[in-house]
Amino acid sequence: VGEAIAKKATELVTTGKLGYYENLKAEFPEGITNLLAIPGIGPKTANRLSGELGINSVDALEQAVKSGRVAKLFRLGDKTADNILQQIQALRRKDQRIPIGDALPVAEEILGALRSMPGVKNLTAAGSLRRFRETLGDIDLMGTADNPKEVIDAFVTLPHIGQVLAQGSTKASAIASGGLQVDLRMVEHDSFGSLLQYFTGSKQHNISLRERGHRQGLKLSEYGITTIATDKLEKFAVEEEFYRRLGLQYIPPELREAQCEVERAEQGSLPKLVELSDIKGDLHMHTDWSDGHNSIEEMTLAARDLGYQYIAITDHSGGRGIAHGLDEERLKKQIAEVRALNERLSGIHVFTGIEVDIRADGSLDLPHEILSKLDIVIAAVHSAMNQSEERMTKRVLNAIENPDVDIIAHPTCRLLGEREPVAINLETIFQAAAKNSKVLEINAMPDRLDLNDIHAFRARDIEVKLAIETDAHSTAHLGFMRFGVGVARRAWCEPQHILNTLPLEELLAFLGGDR
């Protein structure tokens, strides 16, 4: 360290400031560095925005673009102005993870459009999306085609795509709807398997594979597996063959997080993960009796169309006044309607139920006399979420120990990107659920995914039964089941761990006390 740097370091430590840095800052308008963080805005543009329009923040720039002031200053067209807005959205997401509920529909629209093109052989998601992480940084897509350039050209002109960040003959990056960055890579068919494996990740999983390969005298890369002694490269069109070459059972993408999946794959003892087709019904949904948008019959028919054997109608209880919750009298009427519907419809069974509020003191907001008449009782916290860990844990324990309760819904109460989980001792909750033979929910609402994969893995590990439920408030929401299944797969869940993989007769036995 030289004398000048030593002086600056001493000044910074003793005063908390650095005069040299403060002098540099004074030469630039306040907040201009915020503008420079936006891709496409350089020093000259930022200086004009600040000096001529008084814009020194991202928020101010957004408002100026929307009002047309920026377009007027720089004589920009509508598309350029829209690109600036998309870059602002992308910047705001840069330090945030994108919920899978936002990313997956965008990816599926793009994939659907490109798969219809002639000559497209393979096209799929990779990265965090393929591993079904609950949040992701961007969307990675890859595929093979007879004419890769045609696919790339079509990709950048899709209606979902805004600004193109980069484009070549086999790769492109662009900003899609909502500021999502999408990267598309077209590869050679004979290398598709190894490239898909590499770009699916995770990074630590791939490191584990490389270490294993090295011990076998092999070098792994995105292009295939090279035998070090002969420098011979093997390419893999099929991902399963890549794993087989390493002496491993195929590892599903959801498990590739460097836990113990490589060791288990070596032993051939990976779980047979639950699949969407294993789900026999949905036990948590709402109708227009409370805050849902469809009638009981409409929800039932939609579920039957999905091939379900059963559903449970679990509208909110009266404590959720904002949700038009059911009091005892309305619940009695709903029970009668459900029973009449069961007599009239065939091909599906409808369970009576309720999502009853767990009050702040741990009591339920409906009495035993009415709860005991229901087929399924789900209990959930919807209020007083700022309680201490001790009080919240005791509150939920009271519900678990209540003989009327079957399932605890969204146990941590989180909302992705909006509300942090409540303070609760989940290990205590899991142990109590196991002891009392109670079911914990994997709520499949994309903004909940609660329990998450880590918590669901622990619950499964101590033999707590889980239920994947959509919490649907409309017929369209029934499709959210796939998000819950993704969480369960990441939690290493097999069908036997999930309550609603049971056929109707077995579920009836379970609810009747055969737990």
Model-based region annotation:
Residues 1-172, 193-195, 207, 214-228, ...:
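Accessory alpha-helical DNA-binding modules that contact the DNA backbone or grooves
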Residues 123-125, 281-285, 355:
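Two-metal-ion RNase H-like nuclease active-site motif
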Residues 100, 288-289:
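Short acidic-aromatic active-site loops that bind/stabilize oxyanions
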Residues 129, 356-358:
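Hydrophobic pocket-lining residues within nucleotide cofactor-binding pockets
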Residues 26-30, 317-319, 355, 414:
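Short linear capping/connector segments at secondary-structure termini
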Residues 132-218, 222-287, 293-313, 318-349, ...:
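Charged catalytic cores and adjacent phosphate/nucleic-acid-binding surfaces used
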